[in-house]
Structure formats: C-alpha cells, structure tokens
Design a protein with these regions (language model features):
Chain B
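Charged, low-complexity C-terminal accessory regions
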Residues: 25-28, 51-72, 194-230
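Bacterial N-terminal signal peptides that target proteins for export
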Residues: 1-10
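Short, charged N-terminal beta->alpha structural module
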Residues: 71-98
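Bacterial lipoprotein signal-peptidase II cleavage site
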Residues: 6, 20-42
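A short, well-structured beta->alpha microelement
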Residues: 96-116
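Short, electropositive alpha-helical surface patch
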Residues: 170-192
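A short, gly/pro- and small-residue-rich
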Residues: 132-156, 204-211
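Hydrophobic core
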Residues: 15-19
C-alpha cells in the first residue's frame, strides 16, 4: 500500500515537472529578443538607451536606438514603437523604417521596442497572443513577440499602494499598475523605477540629440474615441494638422486632436511640455485590443477581422473604430503608421525648408497593402 | 478512503476540463475574459439617432453642394479664428495654407485684433482639451466670442461659419458655440456629417443664407479656393 502511494506521488511529481518544462519553454521564449535586420546600409549607428539613462544598463528594459543619418543636415525625427508592446503595428512600423529607409537629409532615431521589458510577458487572463510571424519569400520566418502594455512585474516589483511621481499623475487603488506604463510616466526619473528610467532615457535622448518631432506609435480597440487620430501637443498642432490634411487628401481619413492639458505623463503632453520637440502620438485601429472581441486568433491579430465588431458597427453602436467585413489587416495598420510618419516629415520639411527631413526607399502604402509585410521585412542577417 | 479517491478524481477532471477550456482555440491563444479591462463605448447617441437623418446632398461624386445661393468670393483681408477651441481650426489653418490664402490666424483672437479685417472665418466646435490648452473656460470662450461677434456686426465684417468636425463636433457645448456664431453668419461651410439632424440646413433656410455642404474634410479645398479667390 505504502509503495503504491510513493509510486503515485512520483508519477504526479514527474507530471508536474513535465508541465512546468513545457510551459516554461513558452515563458522563456518571451525573454528572447526578436532579431531586427541590420542589412540596411542606411543604418548609421545602433546605441543602447542606457547611454541616455545609465541606470538601465544591464537591465531587461535597456533597448536599442537605431540611428539613420542623412548625408545632408536637417531635422531630427524620433519614432517610438513598442511603447505598448501589444500595439504591434507601431513596433512593425519602426522595424520597417529601420530595415528599409534611406535618409537623404536629417536624422531618424528609431526605438522599435521602447518598453523592452513589456515584450517578456503577456497580460494574465486577457487571452492574448504571444507571438506573431511572417513567412518571407526566401522561406525564412520572422517572429515578433506581442507582449503587453506594462513593464514585466518580475523586472519592476512591487507596485506601490500610492504613487505621485514627477509626471504629475497620481496613482492609487487599481491605477497603481500604471507605474509600469511607459506612457504614463514621462518625463521620467534618472533614479526612479525601471519604467521611469526608460522614460528618462527617452526624455534625455530628445534633449541631448535636439529632436524636432516625436512620433509615438500606438494602437487602440474600436471603442476608443480617438482611433485614427493624431494627438498633438500645441507646439505640434500646425505641423500635425498639415500632415493630417495631406493624409486626407491622399484618401486616408485621419483626424487631429490637441493633447489634453491634464494628460499627465503621456508622451504627447509631458514630452511636449518638458522638451523643445513637437510631440505627437498616433493610434491605429486594432480590433484585437477591444474588450468585446471574439476568441483570440491569428485572423484577428493579423487579419484584423472580428465578427463581433462588424456586428457592433452594423448596429451603429460605434462612433469611432468602425469595422467592416474586410477587417483591418496588420499590413494596413502598419501602412497607416508609415503614412502618418511620412506626412509629418513632409509637413515639417514644408514648415522648415532649411532643415528638411527627406527619407527615401520606403515602400508605399499600396506596397504594404498589396505586397504585405512579408515582402517589406528583410531576412535576418546570418 | 474510497470517498477521498472519488473527490480527488473529480477535482482532477475539473482541473483538466478547466485547462482544456482555457487552452482551446489556436495554438497560442486563449479565450478573452468577459470582464477584461478596456475602454467602454461612449457617445453612441449621435449614430443611434439616425431615424431623424437629414437629406444627404454630397457624395464622392458630388464633393460639395451649396444651398440657398451660390458660393462666392468674399472680401479680403481674411482672419481665421475659433469659437470652442477644437482642433478643427488648426485643420482649417492647414487648408488655408494649402490653397495659398493670405490671412491672419489666431485661435483666440479678440475683437481688437480684427481692425481692417473684412471677412472672419470662424471654426466652431467645442473641445475641453482645446479650452484647457488655451487656459480658458467655456464661459471665458463665450464671452470672447460674444465680444468678437458684436464687433463684427458693428464694423460690417462678414462672418463665415466653418463646421468641419462632423458628428464629433455636435453636442450641447459645441451646439451652443455654433448657435452663437450662426446668428452673425453670412454663410456656412460645413462637413455634411455634422448636419445629420438638419440643424444647419434648416437654419440657413430660415435665414436665407448660403450653406456649402462638403462630403469630407479633404473636399474643402475647392470651396475654400472660391471663398478666398484663389
């Protein structure tokens, strides 16, 4: 009888260990960075954000800054992707610029994974996808982690019961997890939490490199009232409105709104207030982020189709983020970010003809739609 | 002992069932919780009240239409300002630049700024963010607008109301600002989405002033060219 119990316990123990190993493999994969192709001769330099925020050195939140310098001087444009890692079109836009753009005049600074720690986990109980992939024409597969919108608690813990940092945002009760939200804690703190050190790194980079325009790429669920909106700090309203107008003339019905004066800690407010740069943020529509979506699937994340939101749209219940049967694919969402970036550069150049930002070799909107990201992303250098 | 075994087996079955349930779907997916946090649907009333929709005049093929008269060139110098501080004034500024208009722009212009001006184009639409950024309250804005509009009336300055924000610039406060400007307007230019209930076409009809309805904001270029004579 006793032997039977011992054998049973051993079997259970082995089973538990096997489950841990199998699931642990998935968790560990989330800590492995997705490579970005550096074959683009337009890349001048890759530095780490810890050069601007020393406390990040050696931490999971340190992240690459890709610099693409033009032959001629001009304005300086910062593209932020992955502020919220699960808003994947923003990161993919940044990667597309890194892997394809040639800068003729001015400089691009690109941070594709602004919250690098956020890529190492997904949000428990949200039913999120962890990895997306694209098969390239050469047969290779590019994988990208999806991650979630907050810094991983294993990298920044515990969340305080109450927090009032230099962003001016008061965090209490259920809001305290926002202390790990990169887009709530600008301008950051060189000696603050891990997230605040990232915030500070970006803030310090903007000041040190004298960035002219900041583009913070986001996505939002259909219920969000500012889907396909460029949110601009008052200093960026003129250039932002010109850019949005040009996108409309090209058939992209985007809109512009001014940054709220009390949007404490958000990039478009806090970086606009605390630096000389024109701060903007753009939101594309991602049905996978909506709280009324159907089951998570590849079709939802990459195809951007969700029958619930088509039904909600057809019933006239959405005043923003309407979704049709065609869905809104990752190609289209990434293209929307690319177009918005491009038009901001054009509008800046029009307003500052002595310091233009001229970028070539980027695929067109139609290329994104017709050829797809699998033909725009580059194979990883061996 | 036997009862303990039955309970253990039942627990094991329940746990397995729960794992299967949460693990179902695609290889890397799980079901979304119904209580997962996220934004809520807001401001749906405008799209729910479509039973009283006004006649639609514009379309892709007919990008703009003028009712109650003809769209004409107005007298320069032009001045562009806002009543309500929405971002639409900034979009109108971009449009005016696009058509090469010569004008002065100040979203918070005062009556004293309008000396020698012949035509004021006023972008209406309330934005709490815009008011906040300008550091003024809605009441301050109404007082400024009232003073500005009275000055226009006393000095024969033509007022053109521009409503470019569509349904998102309809609502109590936006309509209050629009109503203030309408009373002084000699013409209306608007994106037709904002006239779903016929408010602006009805007003133009009653006052017999021209109203130019525009299909989308991108279709404003041609009407603006006519207004500023470009």
């Amino acid at each position: 009888m006793r032997n039977k119990i011992v054998v049973r316990n051993i079997i259970v123990f082995i089973g538990v260990v096997a489950l841990c190993v199998i699931s642990g493999k998935d968790f560990l994969r989330m800590h492995k960075p997705d490579p970005i192709s550096t074959s683009n001769p337009g890349i001048s330099e890759i530095v780490m954000l810890s050069e601007y925020s020393p406390g990040l050195k050696g931490t999971a939140a340190d992240t690459e800054v890709y610099i693409l310098r033009g032959e001629k001087p001009g304005g300086k444009f910062l593209i932020l992707g992955g502020t919220h890692p699960n808003e994947i079109a923003g990161m993919l836009n940044a990667v597309c610029y890194i892997e394809n753009a040639r800068v003729e005049s001015g400089t691009l600074y690109i941070i594709p994974r602004a919250n690098n720690s956020g890529y190492t986990h997904t949000c428990p109980l949200w039913g999120m996808m962890d990895i997306i992939d694209f098969q390239l024409p050469d047969g290779s597969v590019r994988e990208f982690r999806v991650g979630t919108r907050l810094t991983n608690p294993i990298h920044q813990w515990p969340d305080p019961n109450y927090y009032y940092g230099n962003s001016g945002r008061e965090l209490k009760h259920s809001e305290v997890a926002e202390i790990r939200n990169l887009n709530r804690n600008y301008p950051g703190d060189v000696n603050g939490t891990l997230t605040e050190k990232v915030n500070y790194g970006i803030f310090n980079l903007i000041n040190t490199e004298k960035i002219d325009i900041i583009y913070d790429a986001h996505e939002a669920g259909p219920e969000f009232l500012r889907v396909n909106y460029l949110i601009a700090h008052e200093k960026a309203m003129s250039v932002g409105s010109m850019a949005v107008m040009n996108t409309n003339l090209q058939g992209h019905p985007f809109a512009v709104d001014i940054s709220g004066a009390t949007s404490y800690g958000l990039s478009h407010r806090a970086l606009g207030d605390n630096t000389e740069a024109m701060a903007t943020l753009f939101e594309t529509l991602n049905p996978a982020q909506g709280s009324r979506r159907t089951k998570m699937s590849r079709e939802l994340v990459l195809g951007g189709f969700d029958k619930n939101y088509v039904e909600i749209t057809n019933r006239g219940l959405l005043s923003s983020g309407e979704l049709t049967e065609a869905g809104i694919s990752i190609n289209e969402r990434t293209a929307n970010h690319m177009v918005m970036c491009r038009e901001l550069m054009n509008a800046f150049s029009e307003s500052n003809p002595d310091r233009p930002i001229i970028v070539s070799n980027m695929p067109s909107y139609d290329d994104f739609i017709n050829k797809g990201l699998e033909n725009i992303l580059q194979p990883i250098n061996s | 002992m036997k009862r303990n075994k039955i309970v253990s087996i039942l627990l094991l079955v329940a746990m397995t069932f729960s794992i299967v349930l949460t693990g179902c779907g695609d290889k890397k997916t799980t079901e979304a919780p119904t209580s997962s946090p996220g934004p809520t649907t807001q401001e749906t009333s405008a799209t729910n009240e479509q039973s009283g929709k006004a006649t639609r005049y514009t379309s892709k093929e007919t990008p703009f239409v003028t009712l109650n008269g003809e769209l004409k060139k107005y007298e320069s110098p032009f001045y562009l300002t806002s009543v309500g501080q929405s971002a639409d004034v900034s979009m109108l500024d971009a449009l005016m630049k696009k058509v090469g208009a010569e004008y002065t722009y100040n979203a918070t212009a005062k009556a004293s700024d309008l000396k020698d001006v012949k035509t004021v184009i006023i972008a209406t639409g309330a934005s709490s963010k815009g008011l906040g950024a300008a550091g003024i309250s809605a009441e301050d804005e109404k007082a400024r607008a009232s003073e500005l509009l009275e000055y226009c009336k006393e000095n024969d300055i033509t007022v053109i109301m521009a409503h470019l924000g569509g349904v998102s610039r309809r609502g109590k406060l936006s309509d209050e600002f629009a109503d203030m400007v309408l009373e002084y307007s000699s013409g209306i230019v608007m994106v037709e989405d904002g006239n779903d209930d016929g408010k602006f076409t009805d007003f133009a009809s009653r006052k017999n002033i021209p109203i130019t309805l525009i299909n989308t904001i991108a279709d404003c270029i041609e009407p603006l060219k006519i207004i500023v004579g470009k």
